[in-house]
Amino acid sequence: MRFDKLTTKFQQALADAQSLAARNDHPYIEPVHVLAALLGDPDSGAASLLARAGVAVNRVQPAIDSALKGLPQVQGEDNVQVGRELQSVLVRTDKEAARRGDTYIASELFLLALADDKGDAGRILREAGLQKKALEAAIDAVRGGENVSGAEGESNREALSKYTLDLTERARQGKLDPVIGRDDEIRRTIQILQRRTKNNPVLIGEPGVGKTAIVEGLAQRIVNDEVPETLRGKRVLSLDLAALLAGAKFRGEFEERLKAVLKELAQDDGQNIVFIDELHTMVGAGKAEGAMDAGNMLKPALARGELHCIGATTLDEYRKYIEKDAALERRFQKVLVGEPDVESTIAILRGLQERYELHHGVEITDPAIVAAAELSHRYITDRFLPDKAIDLIDEAGARIRMEIDSKPEVMDRLDRRIIQLKIEREAVKKETDDASMRRLAVIEEELEKLQREYNDYEEIWKAEKAAVQGTQAIKEEIDRVRAEMAELQRKGQFDKLAELQYGKLPELEARLKAADSAEREAGESDSGKPRLLRTQVGAEEIAEVVSRATGIPVAKMMQGERDKLLRMEDFLHKRVVGQDEAVRLVSDAIRRSRAGLADPSRPYGSFLFLGPTGVGKTELTRALADFLFDSEEHMIRIDMSEFMEKHSVARLIGAPPGYVGYEEGGYLTEAVRRKPYSVILLDEVEKAHPDVFNVLLQVLDDGRLTDGQGRTVDFRNTVIVMTSNLGSQHIQSMAGKPYEVIKEVVWDELKHTFRPEFLNRIDEVVVFHGLEAQHIESIARIQLKRLGERLEKQEMRLDVSDAALAEIARSGFDPVFGARPLKRAIQQQIENPVAKLILEGVFGPRDVVPVDWQDGKFVFTRTLQ
């Protein structure tokens, strides 16, 4: 026996047999041990070979187990030896290998030798239906006329079943999603596949446009015989490159596996079409020093037409990997897959609707489908249809399913309250005074009431949940019946098809209708309480998912938000004093956008705020961010004085390729990509270099900007505010004149500084008035209120008299510098003295800090609160 000439698989089987004998205290390794080891290894292929030869494999394993129990056992024997019976079988195996001309002895010849064996192993196989001729035929079929010439000869067998996934089989089983539309691309793919040479289409398109779906659509058409005669009966196999590479430890193993795949494909005489998803991964796959990569190994087969291949890759990766290898590129024919429009996406979603309803066990309404297509197109700009729309449907369905599976919020709230009261009851029980006794009676009464309410809700919830689960089970049964009907139609078994179509299916549909109505009835209790479980995905659920993902308020406005928008001016006036026109113009722009009337291809609003320093230009922008997002954090503030040089424009949008900082992205573009719904403040805009305005033209007109890395950043959900001091001398000199007259003069000044195409794209040029004495007093109140809030954190209260307020306003008023001197006046005249008094211990927690103006100075007299 040539033990050095056993294949790796056979050597492994003998080693496993030795371990099995040692574990069971058997002194000798018998053929039955080796048979058990071969059948126990899922990678050996012995079980599939015996099944192909007509052996009932499920009967073999129990018989082996009982045979092993019948073998003699010797306790404490470590040296396990090869039994005489096994030696005899191995010799016959060696002879059979020599007769067949094999260099290495494969494990299937051991099974062939067992066919003549008189021992347990041979008897077990014969009783399970083994016939020598059938096994020989099965071995010849598996080998495909090849001899075993290497130690890995067995590993590379049936390479297609190991390293590919049969898409046509999955289509036959109904496991692929239906493919709606894409007829032109599928037709073009079929057309290329029918060519004599270079019959290899490559599907090129952006991620998520449906390249893989086109191949799945082709597999479904082949299964349904909706293809030309030349493609009928062919299989579409998806190549699993990861499986090809996994475990290829030694040099040449990967190449051997790929050669085995190519050889099987060549033997099948064009009956298989290989689909390579992410085709660019083939370039460089398995590459080692001096070795060929997968791409180069495929070239000869592709050129000769032996390999029918469909590739799929994105535009960027095609350009980066495939186009660089001209020899590989010319062997493929390009099929460009574009992004479908919103109407096509809606059709695709309607086709997938049933699958997602079945998976999540919820109902997806048509408004939800339309909303998913439209909202994803409008608000999710960095991804592509239909993928991003499908994601919205999927996530909304998952959210509703999660609500169904978990306890409803109203019950959860009651449950927590009941637990809280029970804890309180146990604490009160320990007390003996009258007040505690009365409290205990109140707790008992409330507990009883809450428990009754909870039990009512629980009953409704269980009824609703049972109804939902019943509906789901019927839907799954209908889906299974439809898949069975499709299979029967393909096989032409019309008698059984008619049985299902006119018997079982109508019965199931009637049951579903009854279950649906029962579910609706379960939703309304006797007391008229609303449904506890939502089972429908509507447009609002889709809008909620979009809002959560992007931070953009897409969901339908609640009444509270409507009222808030209508009173927006009041909110802004709390922080900005004396600028009525500016506040009104900004409020109108926000209301237009939230009511859905604004141009969807431009930012919500673009404003140029003009006016002297310290009149509230920046403060209004802060107030706007606070109003929209309840936080000033959503304001992206860019000081344009930092962009005075020509080269600093690159900082806004990111450095071009080849420059330092290319990977970091742009200051403005990255901020908007992270917060697509925000207020952008470009402060002191006239100080920026003129080239900066060229960048802003695209933002103001189309609501988009391309950064240094070629990505399009969406500005359509932003409010852009630019501030400038231009024309401030005219505004101050014309104080008291009508707003329109002042604006006209300032507009003439603007024309000398900014280009017409820039000014023309701004929605509103807002002129801020210089502040007057009465405005300063209101601003002083606002600033002192903020100081009061800071003191309240230290448990102190600020009390400013009218005389003190008037003096602060008087000393802080400067018509040239606006409200900023007021801040300095408060700091010097109030904050500094109060800080000293707090440190000296004059004022402490629970004190009132009074501020008064007496005898030409500020007085702080301590009183208890």
Swiss-Prot record:
Highest taxon in the source lineage: Bacteria
Record GO terms (molecular function): ATP binding; ATP hydrolysis activity
Coiled coil: 390-524
GO annotation, cellular component aspect: cytoplasm
UniProt keyword annotation of Repeat present: yes
One of the Pfam families matching this protein, by short name: AAA_2
Span list, region NBD1: 158-339
Region described as NBD2: spans on this chain: 561-770
Region listing for Linker, in residue ranges: 340-551
Domain Clp R: start-end pairs: 3-145
Region called Repeat 1, residue ranges: 6-71
Positions of region (Repeat 2): 82-145
Entry-linked InterPro entries: AAA+_ATPase, ATPase_AAA_core, Chaperonin_ClpB, Clp_ATPase_C, Clp_N_dom_sf, Clp_R_dom, ClpA/B, ClpA/B_CS1
PROSITE patterns: CLP_R, CLPAB_1, CLPAB_2
Residues at which ATP 1 binds: G205, E206, P207, G208, V209, G210, K211, T212
Binding site for ATP 2: G611, P612, T613, G614, V615, G616, K617, T618
Biological processes per GO annotation: cellular response to heat; protein refolding
Region (C-terminal): 771-865
Domain notes: The Clp repeat (R) domain probably functions as a substrate-discriminating domain, recruiting aggregated proteins to the ClpB hexamer and/or stabilizing bound proteins. The NBD2 domain is responsible for oligomerization, whereas the NBD1 domain stabilizes the hexamer probably in an ATP-dependent manner. The movement of the coiled-coil domain is essential for ClpB ability to rescue proteins from an aggregated state, probably by pulling apart large aggregated proteins, which are bound between the coiled-coils motifs of adjacent ClpB subunits in the functional hexamer.
Subunit relationships: Homohexamer. The oligomerization is ATP-dependent.
Protein name according to UniProt: Chaperone protein ClpB
Naturally occurring in which organism (per UniProt): Bordetella bronchiseptica (strain ATCC BAA-588 / NCTC 13252 / RB50)
